[in-house]
């Protein structure tokens, strides 16, 4: 499902193209060449996804079965919207029955079946607005949030891990029992306190680096499966429609003991 085309792509464009020097800086030219020759970029265009990141989510789902049966999904750091496209398709979300809420401080072009909030997720109002937008208790919270890079690896790691941590605590506050949480992190280790919190609240916690992540990238994904539920209801303190526990996928049993952290 997520393997890139071999020896080219199905659009007829050959890979390995060079970009003329012109007025571009060497670093910009290298980035552009890498982008136009990336088979996942080509495939995203062919299959109608807004970004190559779609294949990261599809690849993770193919192995770990986190989307099947999901009735409502919240997408954090959603721009340009490829994960939201997948979420809308999985949930059957429509403009008349919204089941996907997406948030990003960057502007996003509208997507059918997706309620988009142009807002920083760290805004204190964001959690309540997301829950209002999604129309009920989500089965899955996905986050592709990353802080703007500074070029200093330790600083970038700390800033992105803060976003991951905030997203994780939000997921624990809002997820349906049996739900799943997926978030971007960086190589260099997830903070012990965050891992311990997730292990207390989910049945399985693993790190993943999908093949569709660029080889030179330090990004990884933190997946927490099987939310155990809250003892005292929704921690955000407002009424939402509860569809009950997320339907169990028997395929999860086959991977329950894999790659435990």
From Swiss-Prot:
It is found in: Cytoplasm. Residues 245-254 have a biased composition (Basic and acidic residues). InterPro entries: RNA_methyltr_RlmE, RNA_MeTrfase_FtsJ_dom, rRNA-MeTfrase_E, SAM-dependent_MTases_sf. Its EC number is 2.1.1.166. One of its GO terms (cellular component) is cytoplasm. Residues 233-261 are annotated as: Disordered. Keywords: Cytoplasm, Methyltransferase, rRNA processing, S-adenosyl-L-methionine, Transferase. S-adenosyl-L-methionine binds at residues 81, 83, 104, 120, 144. It is an enzyme of class 2 (transferase). The active site is at 184 (proton acceptor). GO terms for molecular function: rRNA (uridine-2'-O-)-methyltransferase activity. It catalyses: uridine(2552) in 23S rRNA + S-adenosyl-L-methionine = 2'-O-methyluridine(2552) in 23S rRNA + S-adenosyl-L-homocysteine + H(+). Specifically methylates the uridine in position 2552 of 23S rRNA at the 2'-O position of the ribose in the fully assembled 50S ribosomal subunit. Belongs to the class I-like SAM-binding methyltransferase superfamily. RNA methyltransferase RlmE family. This is Ribosomal RNA large subunit methyltransferase E. It comes from Allorhizobium ampelinum (strain ATCC BAA-846 / DSM 112012 / S4). The lineage of its organism: Bacteria, Pseudomonadati, Pseudomonadota, Alphaproteobacteria, Hyphomicrobiales.
């Amino acid at each position: 499902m997520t393997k890139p085309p071999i020896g080219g792509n199905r659009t007829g464009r050959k890979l390995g193209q060079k970009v003329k020097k012109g007025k571009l800086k060497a670093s910009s030219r290298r980035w552009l060449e890498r982008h136009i020759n990336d088979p996942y970029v080509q495939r995203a265009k062919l299959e109608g996804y807004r970004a190559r990141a779609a294949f990261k989510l599809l690849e993770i789902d193919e192995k770990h079965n986190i989307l099947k049966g999901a009735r409502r999904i919240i997408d954090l750091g959603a721009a340009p919207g490829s994960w939201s496209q997948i979420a809308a398709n999985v949930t059957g979300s429509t403009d008349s029955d919204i089941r996907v809420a997406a948030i990003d401080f960057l502007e996003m072009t509208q997507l059918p079946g997706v309620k988009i909030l142009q807002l920083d997720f760290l805004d204190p109002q964001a959690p309540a607005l997301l829950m209002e937008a999604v129309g009920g208790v989500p089965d899955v919270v996905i986050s592709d949030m990353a802080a703007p890079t500074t070029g200093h690896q330790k600083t970038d790691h700390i800033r992105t891990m803060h976003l991951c941590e905030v997203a994780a605590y939000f997921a624990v506050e809002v997820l349906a029992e049996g739900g799943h949480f997926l978030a971007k992190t960086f190589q260099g280790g997830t903070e012990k306190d965050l891992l311990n919190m997730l292990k207390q609240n989910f049945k399985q916690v693993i790190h993943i680096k999908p093949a569709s992540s660029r080889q030179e990238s330090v990004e990884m994904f933190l997946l927490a499966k099987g939310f155990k539920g809250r003892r005292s209801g929704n921690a955000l303190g407002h009424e939402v429609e509860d569809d009950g526990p997320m339907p169990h996928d028997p395929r999860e049993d086959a991977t329950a003991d894999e790659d435990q952290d």
